[in-house]
Amino acid sequence: MESPAGRTPAPGALPYYVAFSQLLGLTVVAVTGAWLGAYRGGIAWESALQFNVHPLCMIIGLVFLQGDALLVYRVFRNEAKRTTKILHGLLHVLAFVIALVGLVAVFDYHRKKGIADLYSLHSWCGILVFVLFLAQWLVGLGFFLFPGASFSLRSRYRPQHVFFGAAIFLLSVGTALLGLKEALLFQLGTKYSAFESEGVLANVLGLLLVAFGAVVLYILTRADWKRPLQAEEQALSMDFKTLTEGDSPSSQ
């Protein structure tokens, strides 16, 4: 049902779930900063603290901002489709740039310390996430922002784009959990099992990551919370149906 101004109102519970997701996401970032500040000495580029740039940037970029980019089409329900696309794409660009800083930080730190690269499951999953994220963005840019792709191609690719977007986000959350556990085992060793305060805080951070991922995924999978088709999108959809199925208004 549309409002008198022609705008489709958001479903009743959607704004509350979106607000809850933002509260969780900001808390994840804050707790990450608190963990690194209180127990790891903070962050810096030209010192032993350079490694700490990595988890902070990855959490902000590939978890929080990527999650927000996926929610754009649920939050902005009545704005022009192209405007929403651009915001969706720009949030992904920002997430990519921040994640790239985090990736450079950890490789540079390893080089300075003589530590081997890409031997752990966390690092393998991290590289996979980064490559998939970049590929997803580039393909999405070609299909949905540049005018070259036809409506039929966009319609056929859209389900894959939606699926891989959610899959990459969940893989990002899982990779962050692997990295968190790896860092705790390296730093605490056997003290981890003694309920050290750092370990407890990091475990809370892990639960917050899971909660943020779960709430974002729930919002994305609610079919009744999808962005409604605008008038021009409905017209294009009808034209595509006419071309592919052979029906026309006169045959109804």
UniProtKB/Swiss-Prot annotation:
Vesicular membrane side: 39-52, 107-125, 181-199
Pfam families, sorted: Cytochrom_B561
Keyword Transmembrane: yes
InterPro entries: CYB561/CYBRD1-like, Cyt_b561/ferric_Rdtase_TM
An example Gene Ontology CC term for this record: chromaffin granule membrane
Topology versus the membrane: Multi-pass membrane protein
Binding site for heme b 2: R74, K81, H88, H161, K226
Subcellular localization, as worded in the UniProt entry: Cytoplasmic vesicle, Secretory vesicle, Chromaffin granule membrane
Cofactor descriptive note: Binds 2 heme b groups non-covalently.
GO molecular function, one term: oxidoreductase activity
Cofactor(s) this protein cannot do without: heme b
Residues with N-acetylmethionine modification: M1
Cytoplasmic side: 1-17, 74-85, 147-159, 221-252
Protein name: Transmembrane ascorbate-dependent reductase CYB561
Lineage: Eukaryota, Metazoa, Chordata, Craniata, Vertebrata
